[in-house]
Amino acid sequence: MDRLKIFITGLSGLLGKALCYEGGDKFNIYGTYFKKDIKCANVSSYKVDIRDKKSLDDLILSIKPDITIHTAAITDVDFCEQDKETAYEVNVNGTRNVLDSTKKVSGKFIYISSDYVFDGNKGYCNEEDMPNPLNYYGLTKLKGEMLSLEYDRSLVIRTSIYGFNPNGTREGIEGIIKDVKEGLTIQAPFDMYNSIISVNMLSKIIYRLILENAQGIYHIGTKRRISRYEFMEKLFLVFDLPRRNLVQIEFKNYQNKKIARRPQDVSLDTNKLTNDFKVIPTTIEDDLNALYKISSSYFAYFGGEQYVSEDL
């Protein structure tokens, strides 16, 4: 049986890299990056801006992927609030371009959305709850969902992620670890919640859903909601970071430092995922420990700078 062709936008991002790491030996992986190429075996990467409809069209039509996983997006919430035009061009029109090209080859389309489509007033949101984004980033992700769901071969995944980003910006947890090693203090709200999951665990579940031919909307996260502060506590414990460098703050104080409004509780109900596919959510402790165990091999896979393993 021929291996599935999987096309990933945003190869150089947190999730893009994890999808390569977790699927490179099982699928034929192709994809795009915007600025910085990734360095890993078993992946064919191309420098293409998803706003460039013709270049994207030409590439996808030449590859004819079975599955397209659209991870590329501007995820800086405050940037999106300040530069709405660029945010819309990338997060909405870019999604439309990727989707249109995917339709032309009759491929399946997987759209990575966000828990920020919700307003944070309820918590443990399920797939039937009405989205109500508080900021422009969340609005662009919701518009991307709406476009995706017009296609009958689409899967929308709402989630919140963390992970390593070898050779990338300091958006990964290696950035947090390096900041702490340099003596900086991390502030985290104790009353702001989500269901954050590592990109590696999320990637495994995405590949499971591909094989299950899942469609519609699914929420993916860890077993229970967790506050930003509690998550940092557990991260500090697993990676043996000094607790004196972690300070808890109130959500209102966190919000005051931001430009865009943030939802306070966007934890996700994942029962639909469990009921439909018997996927049992992991605990955040198991998730962090699994990430710790692969840290050296993960950075080596991408030829990345050893932010983490040299200090562990």
Task: Specify the residue positions occupied by each region the protein language model found.
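NAD(P)H-binding glycine-rich loop region in Rossmannoid oxidoreductase-like domains
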Residues: 50-90
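NAD(P)-cofactor binding segment of oxidoreductase domains
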Residues: 82-110
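Mid/C-terminal beta-alpha module of Rossmann-like enzyme folds, strongest
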Residues: 205, 212-258, 299-306, 311-312
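NAD(P)-dependent short-chain dehydrogenase/reductase
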Residues: 146-194, 199-201, 208
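Rossmann-fold cofactor-recognition segment
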Residues: 42-52
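Catalytic helix-loop patch of NAD(P)-dependent Rossmann-fold dehydrogenases
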Residues: 89, 93-97, 117-157, 161-164
